[in-house]
Design a protein with these regions (language model features):
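Helix-loop-helix junctions that connect adjacent transmembrane segments
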Residues: 35-36, 113-127, 155-293
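Extracellular loop-to-transmembrane helix junctions
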Residues: 19-127, 244, 444-457
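Helix-loop-helix connectors at the membrane interface of multi-pass transporters/channels
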Residues: 68-71, 99-127, 159, 164, ...
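TM-loop-TM module centered on a large, flexible mid-protein loop between adjacent transmembrane helices
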Residues: 68-70, 75, 107-112, 190-193, ...
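Terminal cytosolic tails of multi-pass membrane transporters
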Residues: 1, 386-410, 428-487
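Membrane-helix boundary/coupling elements in multi-pass transport proteins
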Residues: 85-100, 214, 218-227, 289-329, ...
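Membrane-interface loop-to-helix entry segments
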Residues: 129-182, 238-242, 377-382, 392, ...
Length: 487
């Protein structure tokens, strides 16, 4: 896989159209018209952390990425928790992707057939859950066969997403500039100033959402052994993916805000009734009929593409953890024909389906709370990786100004920023009114987020008692050579 394929992989995993429809509304609710500023601010810590990934990958291109690098820098237990954070974050994202894909699939079919009955099928719990499970099974099967077999499929889906976003933004800006929309607002450069956000708490709430929007760009690094020029190409691909994402996010955020405004009624981006699915509300007003189908199709394509590629980081992380004896050996099984971590892929798919069905049957609000808690997982393992870079290269930081900046200062700042978001989110989530409810007076998002991290610590402790080799530092040390998947 070359540079283009790696970039497509990174963008595909992030699923820009899905991220935008899911986060435009909540971000406006948190910070109002400063939404573009928060998207830009969320890019900064991710860019700084990207330097850490790039330098670590150049020195040690291992498919375990965060798990391997953090273990080498800080020891096996910290590395194990970084791997756990990535694994759990992936399962939460995968389950939500399947849910959004199902919703838009029936909306698209309803729009195509002109049937409200078809569009409303998603409201039937049994139909919804069955469709979600089928989508997860299909994505698992495609990931099981490997990226090479579906390369052109991914190219097409990513190209469709970016083309529809450009079309949507152009038409939205054009209609807003015409001046005949009641809720439209004129562009102001103050929208790009994060210092004008009302409060630090509101800023971190919006920042947590924007960080989620960039999650997954590092997927191209987990396939570094299968990439041409594995020392440099994955790092370059990660950077190009990041720039592509921030450009498309800013363009669509500004266009949507100009067209719909930030009001709490009608098509306003702050309307609580449409906040979790903005494109469903804006598709027809912006694109008109029948072209609104394109936006529904783009969301389905975005979720479908990401469903397949998002299995890659978790499967390869589990493969690496198995190779270093941090998890049971069967997770390291590689399919003899497709050369993919088959057992880990199927296990991730099964866990995703069970998680989504279980959470949905408990309460729809619980699903939403797990998404809010996702920011804690993302910030934790990205920050650990950034700090790992600084510590790993600490003896070579004085070699040149470049090394000091890219291996030291930039990753350190990125790690500190993400740690700040983590701690502020943790503080806010403690409040009983944060999320859908409270448990013993503590916000449900705090309970879920901290509970998942504590569950990881418990599993790590139990496995360490059964198979202590990894935790004694016998299987993975700083001098251990990189794990390579042989063809």
């Amino acid at each position: 896989m070359g540079l283009l394929g790696s970039v497509v992989l990174g963008v595909s995993t992030v699923a820009p159209v899905y991220c935008l429809t899911a986060t435009l509304g909540p971000t406006v609710t948190a910070v109002g018209v400063r939404m573009p500023a928060v998207f830009l601010a969320g890019f900064l810590p991710m860019l700084l952390v990207a330097f850490a990934y790039k330098e670590l990958n150049k020195d040690f291109p291992d498919c375990g990425t965060s798990f391997t690098w953090t273990a080498k820098a800080f020891g096996p237990r910290v590395g194990w928790m970084a791997g756990w954070g990535l694994t759990v974050a992936t399962i939460i994202v995968l389950s939500n992707l399947a849910g959004v894909a199902t919703e838009f699939l029936y909306l698209m079919l309803g729009e195509m057939t002109g049937s409200g009955w078809v569009a409303d099928l998603d409201r039937n719990t049994a139909v919804h859950l069955l469709t979600v499970v089928l989508l997860i099974a299909g994505a698992t099967a495609m990931s099981y066969r490997g990226m090479t077999a579906t390369k052109w499929f991914q190219y097409g889906l990513v190209g469709l997403q970016l083309a529809v976003l450009l079309l949507f933004a152009a038409i939205a800006v054009g209609k807003a500039a015409a001046g005949d929309l009641p809720d439209s607002i004129g562009f102001s450069f103050s929208w790009l100033d994060p210092l004008q956000v009302g409060s630090f708490s509101a800023f971190t709430a919006g920042l947590s959402l924007s960080i989620f929007m960039y999650w997954g760009w590092d997927t191209c690094l987990t396939m570094n052994e299968e990439t041409l020029g594995s020392a440099k190409t994955p790092g370059r691909a990660a950077m190009i993916s990041m720039v592509t994402l921030v450009g498309s996010y800013l363009l669509v955020a500004i266009a949507a805000q100009m067209f719909a405004g930030v009001g709490t009624t009608g098509t306003g981006l702050g309307n609580p009734e449409t906040a979790d699915n903005v494109f469903a509300a804006l598709a027809r007003p912006v694109l008109g009929s029948p072209w609104s189908i394109l936006l529904f199709l783009a969301v389905v394509a975005s979720a479908a593409a990401s469903l397949q590629t998002t299995f890659i980081p978790v499967a390869r992380t589990l493969l690496a953890m198995s190779a270093y004896r941090a998890v049971p050996p069967r997770f390291g099984a590689v399919h003899p024909r497709f050369r993919t971590p088959g057992y880990a892929t199927v296990a991730a798919g099964s866990a995703t389906a069970v998680f989504y069905v279980g959470m949905s049957l408990i309460s729809e609000n619980v699903v939403e709370d797990t998404i809010l808690a996702l920011g804690l997982m993302i910030c934790s393992y990205y920050a650990l990786t950034a700090f790992a870079c600084v510590w790993y290269f600490r003896r070579s930081l004085r070699t040149s100004p470049r090394d000091l900046l890219l291996k030291g200062i930039a990753p350190l700042l990125g790690g500190l920023l993400l740690s700040g978001v983590f701690l502020q989110t943790l503080t806010d989530a403690w409040a009983p009114d944060y999320g859908s409810g409270a448990v013993l007076g503590v916000g449900s998002v705090f309970v879920i987020g901290v509970g998942i991290l504590l569950l990881g610590a418990l599993l790590m402790t139990c496995y360490g008692l059964v198979r202590p080799e990894f935790f004694r530092g016998e299987t993975l040390r700083k001098e251990t050579p990189a794990l390579v998947m042989e063809d």
